[in-house]
Amino acid sequence: MKVAVIGAAGGIGQALALLLKNRLPAGSDLALYDIAPVTPGVAADLSHIPTPVSIKGYCGEDPTPALEGADVVLISAGVARKPGMDRSDLFNINAGIVKSLTEKIAVTCPKACIGIITNPVNTTVAIAAEVLKKAGVYDKNKLFGVTTLDVIRSETFVAELKDKDPGEIRVPVIGGHSGVTILPLLSQVEGVEFTAEEVAALTPRIQNAGTEVVEAKAGGGSATLSMGQAACRFGLSLVKALSGEQGVVECAYVEGNGEHARFFAQPILLGKNGVEEIQSYGELSAFEQEALESMLDTLRGDIKIGEEFVQ
């Protein structure tokens, strides 16, 4: 199994590479690519960690050597948020980066599962889909927007509030991956009850947690370490499912039946070909139903921007 991390010299990429070097199954290949010349050095550094995962680093303009034979490609390339920016401010730079990388994937490893981390995810996933479609290789079961950070934040904050072990908390998060489009389904957390006040406070905290980190880092970056952990969790789940493990479920932003929007995050059963089944997210509370309805215009608008960028 070969996993390629694209954007591997950045804050998310390095954290993700470290975690994957430690946690990928024995015999896996890990390829790191970034435009930055430091990338082979990042791989050399990680290669000294004693795990049965082989690692190679590539730099320069062309990601092809890193992509060749990849089963999973995780894209974290692009610029990070700074104070005062929201995820959509990143669009002007990151849209072009995702477009050109996806064009390379379409030629080099068109059958790979692709996990997009680069923000704004609501839009960059639509860009990747349109690029793959133009190249005649689009498989909607193999393209994912990685929204796992919203899930792990939800699990952490719920566990803190309710004094539980975060490893035992599961919170489905649906919608998209920015601001109001992030909808944690607190009504569905097993074994935990919330007051209306708790839901009203916790929901925006989860939605704005990225901004919390951007401001706390005071211009020194955005959420890189927790995002690395989230991307590792999603990447490992993909690897397990592709290897034949049954019952692997993660929330992700994928093209489904289009009920709410062309792309929508909800629980996905993963399998040998990527998306095995898009699972129902169950019944929503009145609060969640209202939040869902009021976010859809924003989400659809984000998707449209991505589609039009490639036209």
Swiss-Prot record:
Name the record gives this protein: Malate dehydrogenase
The gene coding this protein: mdh
Keyword annotations of the record: NAD, Oxidoreductase, Tricarboxylic acid cycle
Family: Belongs to the LDH/MDH superfamily. MDH type 1 family.
EC code(s) of this entry: 1.1.1.37
Originating organism: Aliivibrio fischeri (strain MJ11) (Vibrio fischeri)
Superkingdom per UniProt: Bacteria
Binding site for NAD(+): G7, A8, A9, G10, G11, I12, G13, D34, N94, I117, T118, N119, M227
Job of this protein: Catalyzes the reversible oxidation of malate to oxaloacetate.
InterPro entries for this protein: L-lactate/malate_DH, Lactate/malate_DH_C, Lactate/malate_DH_N, Lactate_DH/Glyco_Ohase_4_C, Malate_DH_AS, Malate_DH_type1, Malate_DH_type1_bac, NAD(P)-bd_dom_sf
GO cellular component, one term: cytoplasm
TM region positions: none
Active site feature: H177
Catalytic reaction list: (S)-malate + NAD(+) = oxaloacetate + NADH + H(+)
Assembly and binders: Homodimer.
GO biological process assignments: malate metabolic process; tricarboxylic acid cycle
Residues annotated for substrate binding in this entry: R81, R87, N119, R153
One Pfam family, short name: Ldh_1_C
An example Gene Ontology molecular-function term: L-malate dehydrogenase (NAD+) activity
